[in-house]
Amino acid sequence: MKKIALVLIIFHLSLLTSLACTNFIVGKKASADGSVFVTYNADSYGSFMPLYHYPAAKHQPGEMRKITEWDTGKYLGKIAEAPETWNVIGNTNEWQLTIGETTFGGRHEMTDSTGIIDYGSLIYITLQRARTAREAIQVMTSLVEQYGYYSEGETFSIADPNEAWMLEMMGCGPNRTKSAERTVWVAVRIPDYAVAAHANQSRITRFLDGRYTPVKLKDLQKKYPVGGKKPVPNLVCYSDNVVKYARTMGWFSGKDAEFSYNAAYAAPDFSGRRYCEARVWSFFNRFADDFSKYVPYAAGIEKDAEPMPLWIIPNKKVSLQDLRDAMRDHYEGTPFALDKDGDIGGGIFQMPYRLSPLSYKHDGKEYFNERPISTFQTAWSFISQMRSWLPREIGGCFWFGNDDGNMVAYTPMYSCMTRLPKCFSGEGADDITFSMDNAFWVCNWVSNMVYPRYSMLFPSLKEVRDSLDQSYDRLQAQTEVRAQALEGDARVRFLTDYSCQKGDEMIDCWRQLAFHLIVKYNDCAVRPTDKQRRFERDQYGRGTRIKRPGMPEGYVKELLKLTGDRFLMPVEEKK
């Protein structure tokens, strides 16, 4: 989950786990139904990630909490526990507060190796302690000032049913004891009518040039309230030392109004633009009439190309399905598309993915692969839906998939639920233990059948995936009407049971899909099925004759350019 902007050698060493995550943010007036949305692809090779559940609890005075690094399990220290903590499902809590992240790395000397709070722990501790996005910003920044921030530079998506923010944070190096100098951070409120995104590259630039209305951290929950008489302006909140620290280190010498957070602390290089900002570009491109002016920036070739804005006003209202589609994106129909004529990088079956590492060398030259939003190494993917007009037990719907978003159906998990479906719990499985009852492993089993023979197998997966997505959409309204007729614990039990049932149904469906794929596509051939996906039998009761599709025409054309007449069939004279 890391993008380390260091020297080239360190960059290559980190490439397998770098350039890892993607987040999208949709304001309530930008969405089709008034929801606030946050999405998150958690991309990390080798990571096994279940759906997390932290039950609500009350804690004794003096109780301490052990902190272990989210990425590695390394013990970092202890912090004081809060008197009361909230129920957390995945990256959302019972108040519909949602937090996502992407790592941008930044200047390596800013990492605080003596800190106790890493970025993952910061997310889940905050979800247990905060109820709104603004409270979350206060909790997160106070925790790292008190205990130190152990991780590299992060961009956080922080949202509740009423508003969304983007927070960027970095440490100030090790052995800092004066709390006001332990981190540098800035938080920007995303306008209600806008969409935003981040993908492992710091995105906040100038914020003291008059475009934003500053608000002090202590006043964040009191001033410019949501739902007040006046519209909420474009707010910014930042640490007192955010500019001073850059001046002290010699990284900035201009006027405060000229200060850019990412220019000072995490300036985008080629990899930050082509691998990271290009994903943001692809998301924005879906909701803009013409976003081609920013192609040179996203491509990373032109050093002085105009950078993209932090957020845009979409040209249409954004729906849940729009976000599913965006999470499954491979740059289709864009200059970065992976399915262009002549590109055989996806193999015989035109896989819209490229093998890692992202760069490789040949004959003394270095080359690179595109890095799309949808990628092999996604451990889980979610779309968090937050709705202010519904009771909070119902309003928070956490659409969850335990693999690459392109290869899963997003299954509804309500944020009030008090237990998990077994398939998402991690029970009986880990990163090196396969289980037929575990969604991570069953979904990865299916996707890893599909990847190498994408154009052949993916249509079968897509049919099942889309059918499940559509069934969940059809059931959502009637399920929530039934939930509104209930109260208190009965409502929570109903939505818990519903969520667990959908999880159980999903994994059963995916197991059946796995069985179907191995039979239908065995030996790189295709067994015919009827419209109900049932295998056909001949008059003797055996499966009907298989079909051998051969190689796609586009691949044949490129192959023959390489092989010439080597495999040209000789013309034999007829006798």
Range-by-range predicted roles:
Residues 467-575:
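Histidine-centered catalytic/metal-binding microenvironments
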Residues 21-119, 139-310, 317-318:
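A contiguous strand-loop segment
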Residues 16-20:
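Sec/Tat signal peptide C-region and signal peptidase I cleavage site
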